[in-house]
Each structure stands twice: as structure tokens, then as C-alpha cells.
Regions:
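Hydrophobic anchor residue at the start of the ABC signature
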Residues: 14
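H-loop/switch region of ABC-family ATPase nucleotide-binding domains
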Residues: 60-61
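A short, surface-exposed alpha-helical micro-motif characterized by mixed small hydrophobic
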Residues: 66-68
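Catalytic Walker B motif of ABC-type/P-loop ATPase nucleotide-binding domains
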Residues: 25-28
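ABC ATPase nucleotide-binding domains
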Residues: 97-139
Length: 139
């Protein structure tokens, strides 16, 4: 494993967990060392696993993963739980992530610029909301 890249090490670790046919998968910073394409594939895999009923407990600083893949978020700051809820509640409250040193995912920021400030977990959601609003305005 020492000769593998960080991304390859992550993929081997995930494959090892899946080989055990477990109901739970624990991932520590799974997108670290992944390029954009590999990160997208990993996020898609996590969605597929979730659809199969596998519970994923993940530790991450990657807010794109949180916005797109998580159904529950626990934020720990200074050894205390400061937030426990759903991603939309975390990201839609003004400045909440920033006070803990977290960054907003680009899709969330763009969504906040649209009328009604809808929650956009990813760019596909943002584009769909944008086109929906545009279509309504053209009528």
C-alpha cells in the first residue's frame, strides 16, 4: 500500500470494507487524494450504497460530499457537538458554516442567489432550479 497514491489507498480501503458485505461502512476523509473525476465516481458509489441500505459513517472536511451525500450531519468544533441536523439546515442559515471554519459548496452558494434561495445540494440541482425559475419568468 505504500506505493499506492492516496486516492488509490482510499479506493482499496473502501473495496476492503465492501468485500465484507457489511451493513455499515466507516470512511475517514474518503475524497482526500481524489481528483475531480475520481471524487465524482466515489460520490456516485456512496449514493448507490445508500440506495442498497448500507449506512455510511463518514468523517470529512469536504462540504460538497456533505451537501450531496449526507442525510444527517454532526459538526464538532473544539471537542463539542455544535450542530446535529440535515445538510440544508446547516447550509441555509446565514454564516453558520463559516463560524466553524467550514466552506459552503459552490452549488449551495449559487442556489442562495436564486429567487427564494432554494437549497441546491449539487450543480445538477442548481441547474434544474435555475431553468425552472427561468421558464416561469418567460411565461
Amino acid at each position: 500500500p505504500r506505493t499506492l497514491s492516496r486516492g488509490d489507498q482510499q479506493r482499496v480501503a473502501i473495496a476492503s470494507g465492501l468485500a465484507m458485505h457489511t451493513e455499515y461502512l466507516v470512511l475517514d476523509e474518503p475524497t482526500s487524494g481524489q481528483d475531480g473525476r475520481e471524487k465524482k465516481k466515489l460520490m456516485s458509489l456512496m449514493e448507490q450504497l445508500k440506495a442498497k441500505g448500507i449506512t455510511i459513517l463518514l468523517v470529512t472536511h469536504d462540504m460538497d460530499v456533505v451537501a450531496k451525500n449526507c442525510t444527517r450531519v454532526i459538526v464538532v468544533a473544539n471537542k463539542e457537538i455544535v450542530f446535529d441536523g440535515v445538510p440544508s439546515d446547516l447550509f441555509l442559515e446565514e454564516n453558520r458554516p463559516g463560524i466553524w471554519g467550514l466552506t459552503y459548496p459552490p452549488a449551495v452558494l449559487l442556489g442562495r442567489c436564486l429567487p427564494g434561495a432554494p437549497y441546491c445540494k449539487d450543480m445538477d440541482t442548481f441547474c434544474a432550479k435555475f431553468l425552472e425559475i427561468r421558464k416561469e419568468r418567460v411565461r
